[in-house]
Swiss-Prot record:
Cofactor note: Requires one Fe(2+) ion for activity. Requires an additional second metal ion that could be Fe(2+) or Zn(2+).
Task performed by this protein: Catalyzes the hydrolysis of the formamide of 2-amino-5-formylamino-6-ribosylamino-4(3H)-pyrimidinone 5'-monophosphate (FAPy) to form 2,5-diamino-6-ribosylamino-4(3H)-pyrimidinone 5'-phosphate (APy).
Residues annotated for Fe cation 2 binding in this entry: H31, D40
Species this chain originates from: Methanococcus maripaludis (strain DSM 14266 / JCM 13030 / NBRC 101832 / S2 / LL)
Protein name, UniProt field: 2-amino-5-formylamino-6-ribosylaminopyrimidin-4(3H)-one 5'-monophosphate deformylase
Listed GO biological process terms: F420-0 metabolic process; riboflavin biosynthetic process
Length: 221
């Protein structure tokens, strides 16, 4: 039996090895002209990996499936069951390497509908929590955050217009706006204020998100 040196390296404490971080986003979803279709997955992975590096918690990778409200039609998504089953796979294998607590960093609003099913995976010796970052779709905050992460094409911002790409702010997603008041309010805000790149705010938002998740990990130790 190998004696592992759990105290080695830049970590908060040896107990942090019992915490696993999972990224959750969406891989196949339109985000206008300036952001890639896997924006949510890349932002979630970027934050999760950086939190892992800072704290010493284990980065377990990203969930491949994602889900969405049935009336939001801007991408290709999976069932709640598909997402939960993939999380189960990561949790089961994470427990084999000594992980007892799991933090899911979710950066896709549609995935919040898994929360009730996710709670059922908790047990007395396995704790799972999901904390979500939900920004107005492909709009100012997400564009600026995408810039900070390094996935935004500034050249394509000139064409990043909700009148052309209806998924921006969900301005053109009529059914979603009719069925979800929060979506409609966000869409109206985008219609009134437009979409622009704020580089300073993007970097600040990214740092704040990373620091927030670092604190969550600290509280899980």
């Amino acid at each position: 039996m190998i004696d592992l040196r759990y105290s080695s390296g830049n970590i908060f404490s040896e107990s942090v090895h019992e915490i696993g971080i999972i990224a959750l986003g969406s891989f196949l979803e339109n985000h206008g002209s300036a952001l890639p279709i896997d924006t949510d997955a890349k932002i979630a992975s970027y934050i999760a990996l950086n939190v892992s590096i800072i704290t010493g918690a284990k980065f377990l990778g990203i969930v491949l499936p994602s889900t969405e409200y049935s009336y939001v039609k801007h991408g290709i998504h999976d069932s709640i069951e598909d997402v939960i089953n993939y999380i189960k796979y990561l949790v089961e294998n994470g427990r084999k390497i000594g992980i007892k607590k799991f933090l899911i960093i979710n950066c896709h609003g549609g995935n919040t509908i898994i929360e009730d099913e996710l709670l059922k995976l908790n047990s007395k010796d396995c704790f799972i929590t999901m904390n979500s970052v939900c920004l107005t779709h492909a709009s100012t905050e997400e564009v600026s955050l995408g810039y900070a992460v390094g996935i935004l094409s500034e050249d394509k911002m000139k064409d990043h217009d909700p009148k052309v790409y209806g998924e921006i702010g969900m301005v053109g997603l009529t059914e979603a706006r009719e069925k979800n008041e929060a979506i409609d309010l966000e869409a109206k805000s985008v219609e009134e204020n437009g979409v622009f790149l704020d580089k300073v705010n993007g970097k600040s938002l990214l740092n704040d998100l990373i620091n927030n998740y670092v604190e969550i990990v600290k509280n899980m130790i």
